[in-house]
């Protein structure tokens, strides 16, 4: 789940509680209109929200990583997964991968590379640069479902870690507050004793 997204909980008339998880938003990049339509269809069948672009340059514009010239410099833009073809004119899928991993806003977003060529050095190069997976075309529905499940598991784990971190911070803040209160109580008690002692000394002089 991307930062800022909310998991909706719906209670039907019968009283049974159901949890509706937000759909994954996938940015699909491919210069081939046929391949673009195929991956879009597979993603939609897998209940994903899909945005398609025809080049690496357009992908950078959509993500707002083109030096501020893009049309989607939106602070609330959420992309859960980027799927890109490797061989594209201009900016290749490999170059796009590097640009994404160099950015502060999208470096944590998983990137999957697609290619019709099974070239081992190319695959190793992409994985080394941080690609989540390297898929051979034609991409199958089973590939898309497997990737989706992997992303959802990763995001669920990240949410769990964030939740534990927040709980630990709250506990630490609570302990600090309690310690500060105890120190104040000790100081108040010490001050009261000192004032009582001074009063007794004054009365004894009188």
From Swiss-Prot:
A molecular function GO annotation: phosphorelay response regulator activity
Protein's cellular compartments: Nucleus
CDD domains for this protein: REC_typeA_ARR
Domain of life of the native organism: Eukaryota
Pfam families registered for this protein in UniProt: Response_reg
Renumbered residue ranges of the record's region Disordered: 165-206
Keywords: Cytokinin signaling pathway, Nucleus, Phosphoprotein, Transcription, Transcription regulation, Two-component regulatory system
InterPro entries: ARR-like (IPR045279), CheY-like_superfamily (IPR011006), Sig_transdc_resp-reg_receiver (IPR001789)
Modifications the protein undergoes after translation, according to the UniProt entry: Two-component system major event consists of a His-to-Asp phosphorelay between a sensor histidine kinase (HK) and a response regulator (RR). In plants, the His-to-Asp phosphorelay involves an additional intermediate named Histidine-containing phosphotransfer protein (HPt). This multistep phosphorelay consists of a His-Asp-His-Asp sequential transfer of a phosphate group between first a His and an Asp of the HK protein, followed by the transfer to a conserved His of the HPt protein and finally the transfer to an Asp in the receiver domain of the RR protein.
Residue span(s) of domain Response regulatory: 25-152
Membrane-spanning intervals of the chain: none
GO biological process: cytokinin-activated signaling pathway; regulation of DNA-templated transcription; response to cytokinin; stem cell population maintenance
Signal peptide region: none
Upregulation: By cytokinins (BA and zeatin) and nitrate.
Tissue: Predominantly expressed in roots and young flowers.
Modified sites of kind 4-aspartylphosphate: 85
Keyword Metal-binding: no
GO cellular component, one term: nucleus
Entry similarity comment: Belongs to the ARR family. Type-A subfamily.
Cited function: Functions as a response regulator involved in His-to-Asp phosphorelay signal transduction system. Phosphorylation of the Asp residue in the receiver domain activates the ability of the protein to promote the transcription of target genes. Type-A response regulators seem to act as negative regulators of the cytokinin signaling.
Name listed for the protein in its UniProt record: Two-component response regulator ARR7
Organism: Arabidopsis thaliana
């Amino acid at each position: 789940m991307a930062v800022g997204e909310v998991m909706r909980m719906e209670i039907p008339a019968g009283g049974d509680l159901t949890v509706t998880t937000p759909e994954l938003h996938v940015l699909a990049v491919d210069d081939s209109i046929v391949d673009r339509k195929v991956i879009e269809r597979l993603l939609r069948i897998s209940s994903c929200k899909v945005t398609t672009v025809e080049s690496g340059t357009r992908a950078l514009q959509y993500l707002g990583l083109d030096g501020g010239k893009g049309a989607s410099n939106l602070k609330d833009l959420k992309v859960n997964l980027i799927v890109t073809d490797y061989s594209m004119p201009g900016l290749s899928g490999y170059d796009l991968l590097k640009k994404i991993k160099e950015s502060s806003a999208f470096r944590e977003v998983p990137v999957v590379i697609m290619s019709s060529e099974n070239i081992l050095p190319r695959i190793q190069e992409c994985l080394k640069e941080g690609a989540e997976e390297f898929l051979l075309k034609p991409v199958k529905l089973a590939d898309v479902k497997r990737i989706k499940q992997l992303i959802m598991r990763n995001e669920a784990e990240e949410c769990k870690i964030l939740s534990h971190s927040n709980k630990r911070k709250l506990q630490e803040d609570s302990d600090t507050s309690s310690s500060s209160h105890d120190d104040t109580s000790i100081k108040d008690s010490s001050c009261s004793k000192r004032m009582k002692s001074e009063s007794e000394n004054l009365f004894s002089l009188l």
